[in-house]
């Protein structure tokens, strides 16, 4: 790995490479189908269609449950966490993106501090070192960045590949039979993916799938398996193949924790660039929407994508262009192919007596572009 590559250079190269390449039971049901018809491992050909959004009425299969709140605050986060916490016990890992130095869009630290103090006092935030050079590619630099960004003020972050790596099996994988993750990931009994939903230079969008698939893969081996593959180039994998490799990495972690896992996506400060871009991230244009939570990873990410697509044209165009140009919607279809969850769901509006709504109703009244919320 070229340790000298900078974060800014990473974002630029990622974009260039892509341009050149121009409820529980849901997942179990799908997994049973995959068990009957396993993904072929000899024909390593990426799927297609990652640039095409599939409307809700064109999807089939069972429905999961996704909770939704417009309350973008610590109180809103705690309220929605209560809806998905039932199976989170023992030693809990909270996987979130702690960001590059001074990253402007990461989840507000006071929200996470309140969640941990009131709901998860024995939990740890977990992270891994990065594949690219910057503020987090070594444990020493990573810890300095954690101080800079305010995480060290209230918790100790477990950098899970600090003490080595471990291999987790990838059920029904096309690209992998196993994935390399930070060894300390195995020290936890349950897992909460607390994700800042936003765009991504290579992934198109970063939801729970990206947070886990890239964020739990260790910096030296796992991330290289995803990004480089057999190409011989540091950033040689992109578009549908990248989405599939990332998703298989996620599958390794999700399968390891079984039903002891939940997913929360925060749709706030949604730059087209990931928090790995730090201060070089493009300005936020897409307006804030709210928070979703589910025990179904596909349904959680799909609901966020649906909410973005339900926005007015001028509000969504930048983020939608990023998603479609990177063929990122293959993340969703491949999670379904892998038996990881449902792309259909009941969206429960916890702000209004648990009324079942759709994405259009969730974003009703949102127009224009992003306005800072003061957090």
Task: List the predicted regions and their residue ranges.
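N-terminal and secondary-structure boundary signal
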Residues: 2-5, 9-21, 27-375
């Amino acid at each position: 790995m070229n340790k000298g590559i900078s974060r800014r250079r990473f974002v630029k190269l990622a974009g260039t490479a892509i341009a050149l390449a121009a409820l529980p039971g849901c997942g179990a049901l799908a997994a049973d189908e995959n068990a009957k018809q396993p993904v072929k491992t000899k024909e390593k050909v990426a799927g297609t269609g990652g640039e095409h959004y599939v409307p809700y009425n064109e999807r089939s299969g069972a429905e999961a449950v996704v909770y939704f709140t417009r309350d973008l605050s610590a109180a809103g986060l705690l309220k929605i966490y209560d809806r998905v916490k039932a199976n989170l016990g023992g030693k809990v890992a909270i996987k979130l993106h702690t960001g590059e130095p001074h990253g402007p869009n990461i989840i507000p630290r006071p929200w996470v501090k309140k969640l941990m103090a009131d709901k998860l006092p024995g939990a740890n935030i977990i992270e891994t070192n990065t594949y690219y050079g910057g503020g987090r590619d070594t444990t020493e630099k990573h810890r300095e960045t954690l101080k800079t960004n305010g995480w060290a003020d209230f918790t100790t972050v477990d950098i899970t590949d600090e003490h080595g790596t471990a291999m987790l099996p990838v059920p029904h994988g096309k690209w992998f039979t196993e994935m390399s993750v930070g060894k300390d990931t195995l020290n936890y009994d349950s897992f909460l993916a607390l994700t800042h939903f936003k765009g991504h230079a290579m992934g198109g969008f970063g939801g729970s799938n990206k947070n886990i698939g890239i964020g739990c893969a260790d910096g030296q081996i796992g991330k290289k398996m995803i990004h480089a593959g057999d190409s011989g180039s540091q950033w040689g994998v992109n578009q549908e193949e990248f989405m599939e490799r990332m998703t298989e990495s996620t599958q390794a972690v999700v399968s390891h924790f079984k039903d002891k896992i939940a997913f929360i996506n925060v749709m706030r400060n949604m730059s087209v660039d990931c928090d790995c871009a730090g201060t070089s991230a493009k300005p936020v244009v897409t307006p804030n929407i709210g928070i979703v939570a589910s025990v179904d990873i596909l349904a959680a990410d799909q609901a966020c994508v649906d909410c973005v697509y339900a926005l007015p044209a001028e509000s969504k165009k930048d983020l939608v262009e990023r998603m479609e140009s990177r063929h990122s919607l293959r993340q969703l279809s491949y999670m379904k192919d892998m038996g990881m969850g449902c792309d259909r769901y009941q969206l429960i509006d916890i702000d209004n007596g648990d009324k079942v709504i759709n994405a259009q109703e969730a974003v009703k009244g949102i127009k224009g572009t992003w306005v800072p919320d003061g957090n």
